[in-house]
Amino acid sequence: MNASLRTDDVMRYQDARFQTLAAKLLPTQYLVVDDTTALTTTLGSCVAACLRDPVLKIGGMNHFLLPEGNAGDGAPARYGSYAMELLINDMLKRGAHRKRIEAKVFGGANVLKGFTSNPVGTRNAEFVRQYLQAEHIPIIAEDLCGIHPRKIWFFADTGRVVVQRLPHAHEAEVAATESAVRARLSKAPVTGGVELFE
């Protein structure tokens, strides 16, 4: 399994603000939970999709860097198309029903200076809206685009999402983190292979 896809690599901690166990997702990660764990991440131009089956109270979050790309490049979870498939398929494996899944989507801020023509944040936001529409998954809440990075907490058991818009002082930090991840992933060796199951 590609290291960027491993859900057991997600950092878990006790969140003092909400007094609950939390799991902090970094770019390329996703996680599905069926308990009171808060899923949290910090977003600049990246997007996080929070999906939930309200009947089973199961939900998950992903964090992707770019809308689409070459899934065979060694780090496919950086791309929204693959990250969305991973999240949806994991939820379905755990018993979620596709027709009940609903979405809340966040991020896509244009925090990278100098990218005024077709910025990454805008492309990510457009992608997630189009993808979910094509999959017939309703978006019941969103906070996309703009210029501010965000920190979000998603509570899959209740469907609640808390969004904290970060001040401009955090823009450089979030943009630097996202740029560093993009640079690291662009140098990732091409890996992969085919496993045949009979």
From Swiss-Prot:
Belongs to the CheD family. PANTHER family: CHEMORECEPTOR GLUTAMINE DEAMIDASE CHED-RELATED. Probably deamidates glutamine residues to glutamate on methyl-accepting chemotaxis receptors (MCPs), playing an important role in chemotaxis. The keyword Hydrolase applies. It comes from the Bacteria. It comes from Stenotrophomonas maltophilia (strain K279a). NCBIfam families: PRK13487.1. InterPro entries: CheD-like_sf, Chemorcpt_Glu_NH3ase_CheD, Cytotoxic_necrot_fac-like_cat. It catalyses: L-glutaminyl-[protein] + H2O = L-glutamyl-[protein] + NH4(+). The keyword Hydrolase applies. Keywords: Chemotaxis, Hydrolase. This is Probable chemoreceptor glutamine deamidase CheD. GO terms for molecular function: protein-glutamine glutaminase activity. One of its GO terms (biological process) is chemotaxis. Its EC number is 3.5.1.44.
